[in-house]
Amino acid sequence: MKRLQNKVAVITGAASGIGKETALLFLEHGANVVLADMNKITLEETFELIKQKNLDQNACICLTDVSVERDIETLVDMAVDQFGTLDILFNNAGIGGAIGPITHINADEWDRSFQILLKSVFLGSKYAARVMKKNVTGGSIINTASIAGMGGGSGPLAYSAAKAGVINFCKNAAIELGPDKIRVNAISPGAINTPLLATAIEDSKLDQPIEDFGMPIDIANTALFLASDESRFITGINICVDGGLTLDQSGLMKDAAEHYSKMGIERVVGMNMGSTGIESVIENLEE
């Protein structure tokens, strides 16, 4: 059964990791998908893979900086122009963001982190909701948050604070958009084997009930449920896909502290741009 037959979806951060896996899954379930990313090389590579699977008639790509309002407006317009409407938005684009001690983080890098991690969620929702309000069946907005946004000690400061904002945004937007049958939900991944966490995956073994690292398909399957009509009565929630990691917050903080200690994160400062194609700049702090 194709669970998204004839629905139209926009997915940001679609060139790799969770976004790529979700785009492929949505296409396999009958959706028309606009894939957005700021990494031109990996975006085109992903579209080539879609062509190989003979799914390209239901897909198109859009080079997008999710922190730029005009780019988001263009992205949503593309979905409507190509496929007639917009039913699903998956705000998934992200970066590691500014890292380092609070006393040394660069303010511009802090702002840039929030632009990509949080402002993008607002912008995507703003323009998607304008279209979804016209739909008889409303729509589904799905936002990638993180377990780092649920408490202290489980991620870099800027990243964690921005993801906490994503979770709260979902709750408030769900209340506002509910009367229009627009559902707004978040997914908080735990340790997922993606390009953004590749180093951590190699260096760590987290203490959690399900003793394994998650895969992008685990998040994609959750997004598929939230995008489908099966979740028609669910809004404003945050689903943790983390192998039970957050069930023991003390263990989570201990594991995170050990991981960041191994990375020497308290001794470096800079900006982790993830898989955007923009070089990360991280420097050692002077003693």
Provide a role label for each language-model segment.
Residues G96-D111, R130, K134, G155-A158, ...:
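Conserved mid-core segment of classical short-chain dehydrogenase/reductases
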Residues K2-V34:
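Canonical Rossmann dinucleotide-binding motif of NAD(H)/NADP(H)-dependent dehydrogenases/reductases
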Residues I102-T103, G151-L157, P179, E211, ...:
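Active-site loop immediately N-terminal to the catalytic Tyr-X3-Lys motif
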Residues A186, E202-I234, I239-G243, V268-E287:
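C-terminal helical subdomain
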Residues R130, I175-P179, R232:
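Alpha-helical segment proximal to the catalytic Tyr-Lys
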Residues S146:
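Residue(s) in the substrate-gating loop at a strand-loop-helix junction
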Residues T103-F122, I142, Y159, V166, ...:
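Catalytic Tyr-X3-Lys loop
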Residues S125, A162, C170:
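Active-site helix of classical SDR
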